Amino acid sequence: ADTIVAVELDTYPNTDIGDPSYPHIGIDIKSVRSKKTAKWNMQNGKVGTAHIIYNSVGKRLSAVVSYPNGDSATVSYDVDLDNVLPEWVRVGLSASTGLYKETNTILSWSFTSKLKSNSTHETNALHFVFNQFSKDQKDLILQGDATTGTDGNLELTRVSSNGSPQGNSVGRALFYAPVHIWESSAVVASFDATFTFLIKSSDSHPADGIAFFISNIDSSIPSGSTGRLLGLFPDAN
């Protein structure tokens, strides 16, 4: 199975797999059962921003999800990613729908990682920014139902021609270049990621959510991972 670390923006409470009984953000380490969650007031049809940071000195992964009206949710979890992830990874965005559905639209995405090495005091950095997504976006690996180019956005899950979200859909987008996320000789490994998103649904219960994830470089969508598994995990263990 893939090795996955993720920050989930979970719109549907699957209490049977340990979700709290409300929409939440959570930090997932190798399992969809979040290590830590925080209540999130998801605003249907409004553009939100997610900001994720990690620093190997503090060994803390943190996320803030906010809306223009100032409403925000914060979650953090102490973890040493050296012990969890391989040295080289890919970073991506994932989303799913199930019986209930929503649009999982990404409007922009940026990422920066830095490795400050002991020996040379140099920093190896990888940085990318997408302020919009073109139809033929060469530097993204699209998996499942993910598509780019509609209105300059990235649609992670299936949307009909009139813009209605479709159920039982899963899609992911990964940056094409592998990221050197840690190195034994590095003094500091850090990264931050930001994406803006629009979740829209006419269902009484939008589902299922969007995640920023880090994985082994050959990661693919697990079979049967629509709905509550967010396109990340093969099962709910």
Curated annotation (Swiss-Prot):
InterPro entries, per database record: ConA-like_dom_sf, Lectin_LegA_CS, Lectin_legB_Mn/Ca_BS, Legume_lectin_dom, Leguminous_Lectin
Protein's UniProt keywords contain Thylakoid: no
Binding residue positions for Ca(2+): D10, Y12, N14, D19, D208
Chain positions recorded as a carbohydrate binding sites: Y12, L99, Y100, R228
Domain of life of the native organism: Eukaryota
Record carries keyword Glycosyltransferase: no
Binding site for Mn(2+): E8, D10, D19, H24
Key words, A-Z: Calcium, Lectin, Manganese, Mannose-binding, Metal-binding
SUPFAM superfamilies found in the cross-reference section: Concanavalin A-like lectins/glucanases
Any matching Pfam family: Lectin_legB
GO molecular function: D-mannose binding; metal ion binding
Other information: Binds one manganese (or another transition metal) ion and one calcium ion. The metal ions are essential for the saccharide-binding and cell-agglutinating activities.
Subunit structure, interactors included: Homotetramer.
Alphabetized PANTHER family for the sequence: CONCANAVALIN A-LIKE LECTIN FAMILY PROTEIN, LEGUME LECTIN DOMAIN-CONTAINING PROTEIN
Family membership: Belongs to the leguminous lectin family.
Role according to the record: Glucose/D-mannose specific lectin.
This protein's name: Concanavalin-A
